[in-house]
């Protein structure tokens, strides 16, 4: 006789399966959940990539830093770093470091000597020019914003 044919055994088996599923789901948290997320701030920037001020964006892997408030518009929590990946492809990242983002010194900048990566000098987190983690305690990559290029006008929004 099949033991699951007994209604009590079937009920017990279902209860056990549900308990196991709940345990597995509860264990799915990660370390990154322990760090607060970067606060929302409006990002609405427009810049002409042919402007001399943004000359670094004329070459692949060229990058510029934009302030929170400036002639280009609103730039997030602590400003935006714009990186040219290739002709017509730009990436834009929040300068607020994902590691302890409410710390006053949580600020990501281009590495001055090389300009080949970005880093937060406060916590020593490092990121490549695609915003991915390459070192340090940060649990997340850089917050990325949307970009669209229309002619020579680059728009950055969230």
Regions found by a protein language model. Name each.
Residues 31-113, 143-158:
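N-terminal pre-ligand scaffold of iron-sulfur
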Residues 97, 119-120:
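Short cysteine-rich clusters marking metal-coordination/redox-active sites
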Residues 2-17:
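Bacterial N-terminal signal peptides that target proteins for export
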Residues 24-27:
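C-terminal motif of bacterial Sec signal peptides marking the signal peptidase cleavage site
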Residues 46-48, 120, 128:
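Acidic/polar residues at beta-strand termini and the immediately following turn/coil
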Residues 122-158:
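Short Fe-S-cluster ligation motifs
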């Amino acid at each position: 006789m099949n033991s699951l044919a007994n209604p009590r055994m079937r009920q017990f088996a279902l209860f056990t399966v549900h308990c196991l599923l709940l345990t597995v789901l509860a264990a799915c948290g990660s370390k990154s959940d322990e760090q607060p997320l970067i606060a929302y701030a409006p990002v609405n920037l427009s810049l002409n990539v042919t402007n001399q001020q943004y000359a670094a964006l004329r070459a692949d892997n060229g990058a510029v830093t934009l302030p929170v408030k400036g002639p280009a518009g609103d730039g997030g929590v602590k400003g935006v770093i714009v990186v040219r990946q290739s002709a017509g492809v730009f990436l834009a990242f929040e300068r607020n470091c994902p590691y302890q983002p409410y710390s006053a010194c949580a600020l990501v900048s281009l590495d001055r000597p090389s300009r080949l990566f970005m880093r937060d000098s406060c916590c020593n987190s490092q990121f490549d020019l695609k915003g991915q983690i390459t070192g340090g305690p940060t649990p997340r990559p850089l917050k990325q914003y949307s970009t669209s290029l229309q002619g020579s006008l680059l728009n950055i929004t969230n």
